[in-house]
């Protein structure tokens, strides 16, 4: 599948709208969105919690059995 190179080129004459300019218009309390930190998961997914008969292997707790 081939495309002409003209379709892939950017037009340098058009100004690019920057997000930083748009962010300055917002309320300072609404500038940042809360993103929770992903937690590490072991080979058993979210089973790695200290509930039930679990055995410690390094930094994780695996089901004993």
From Swiss-Prot:
Expression (tissue specificity): Expressed by the venom duct.
Keyword Signal: yes
Signal peptide: 1-12
Any one GO MF annotation of this record: toxin activity
Top-rank lineage group of the source organism: Eukaryota
Post-translational modification Serine amide, affected residues: 64
UniProt propeptide residues: 13-48
Parts forming coiled coils: none
GO cellular component terms listed in the entry, alphabetical order: extracellular region
Keyword Disulfide bond included in the entry's annotation: yes
Disulfide bond annotation, renumbered to this chain: none
Compartments it resides in: Secreted
UniProt keywords, alphabetically: Amidation, Cleavage on pair of basic residues, Disulfide bond, Secreted, Signal, Toxin
Domain note: The cysteine framework is C-C.
Protein family membership: Belongs to the conotoxin M superfamily.
Subunit structure: Homodimer; disulfide-linked.
Protein name (record): Conopeptide Vt3.2
Species assigned in the record: Conus planorbis (Planorbis cone)
């Amino acid at each position: 599948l081939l495309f002409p190179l003209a379709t892939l080129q950017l037009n340098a004459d058009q100004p690019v709208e920057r997000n930083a300019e748009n962010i300055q218009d917002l309320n300072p309390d609404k500038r940042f969105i809360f993103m929770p930190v992903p937690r590490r998961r072991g080979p058993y997914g979210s089973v790695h919690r200290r509930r039930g008969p679990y055995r410690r292997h390094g930094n994780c707790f695996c089901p004993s059995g």
